[in-house]
Amino acid sequence: MPATNARRWVPDVLRDAGEDDTVVYTVGVRASLDPESWSLIFMECYDAEDEQNISLGMDTYCLVVGPGQWTVYGGVVECELSDDRLILRLTERAAEKLRTPAEMGFGLALDSTKLEVLRRGLRRVLTSGRANAVPQRLVV
């Protein structure tokens, strides 16, 4: 497989989800319980009114893919969550920054508690910050 395609790999199934609200609210999913496994973290906008954040385009939610800590602000066009599937469509720019495909579909192997954490967290994070960065389609 060419290196350019290798950087676009994402897991088929996500098996863990969690949230943290100590400083900035985050919700994340990962491929396994292994702390080094592939992960996707959604961070709520911290200060949408800050002039520097606005000038840098950091006045909205943030996504981080690990390992590697690839980061982008905004960029989710569509997000759809069901009991067993998470579908994301990103802008090409966001996908390039995160080293992921622009369209991703994940199977979910989450219990009902973790699924509710993810549902609540995605709704909270993806509607934070600049209004024009909110996904055009958000079904959670």
List each model region and its residues.
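Charge-rich, low-complexity N-terminal segments
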Residues: 1-40
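A short, structured beta-strand/loop element
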Residues: 81-96
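Extended Gly/Ser/Thr-rich low-complexity repeat segments
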Residues: 36-49, 97-111
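Mixed-charge, glycine-accented linear interaction segment located at domain edges/termini
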Residues: 98-140
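A short, structured loop/turn motif at beta-sheet edges
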Residues: 80-84, 111-114
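Acidic, aromatic-enriched beta-alpha/helix-loop junctions
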Residues: 37-80
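Short polybasic amphipathic segments
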Residues: 27, 60-62, 86-89
